[in-house]
Amino acid sequence: YCFQKINRPGESDEGCILDGKLYPFGEISRTENCYRCSCSRDAMRCCTLFHTPVGYNKEKCKVVFNKESCNYDVVQKDDPSKECFVYSRV
């Protein structure tokens, strides 16, 4: 998933603002919220670093976002210490 945020005139002379945080002009390999971005005077273009699991046992498993790894973990509802098999992500 990717998006673009157009910078308002005079919004910042030092970089781009995303989710209340200032990022410098240029390439940002990872934001606080797990996006890879490019910041220019005109706009900020970002894409997610994570893929959303869609193919897994939804009855026995649940999805939990892991901000440290910038990915979704799919774990057993009964025992979250055990991972579930995921056969497709988008």
From Swiss-Prot:
InterPro entries: PSP94 (IPR008735)
GO CC annotation, single: extracellular region
UniProt keyword Disulfide bond, yes or no: yes
Protein name (Swiss-Prot/TrEMBL): Beta-microseminoprotein
Family recorded in the similarity comment: Belongs to the beta-microseminoprotein family.
The gene coding this protein: MSMB
Valine amide modification, residue list: 90
Organism from which the protein derives: Struthio camelus
Sorted UniProt keywords: Amidation, Disulfide bond, Secreted
Gene3D superfamilies linked: 2.20.25.590, Complement Module, domain 1
Subcellular location: Secreted
PANTHER family: BETA-MICROSEMINOPROTEIN (PTHR10500:SF7)
Disulfide partners: 2-16, 34-70, 37-46, 39-47, 61-84
The organism's place on the tree of life at top rank: Eukaryota
